[in-house]
Amino acid sequence: FKTIGALPYLYESNLRRFCKTHQGDIDEGLLDVHLWSHERHSFHLKGLLSDDDYALLTGSNLNPRAWRLDLENGLLIHDPQGCLHGQHQAELGRILARTRRLDHHTALDDTGTYPVPVQRILKRLARTRADRLLNQVL
């Protein structure tokens, strides 16, 4: 087993912790978390829609590390008249067709179900708080 193999589990445990923290918002329909599910490829988010008014299109990853380190360009579109609303909804529909909504944090695997080598690595990272550092780096 290679240490890098624990990375997807670290991502999943971070997502589970986030969803557990915000479970009330998920229950009330204030927060939707969708998991990408496609048999042939993964999805790497590169855009953001906000309130049918703003769209951010970028080559940059949408995470704090990328915003600190990456020097990629982005395009922020302000569309108060909703001229692009139809296009945005169509694209969102194509994306959501390949996702499933996460209703509860317990739908994600608990770290206790991970392979033993992964559990050891994640415990070691958490004990030394290196998981926090890794989250900043990744």
Q: What are the residue ranges of the model-derived segments?
A:
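PLD/PLD-like phosphodiesterase catalytic module centered on the HKD motif
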Residues: 1-138
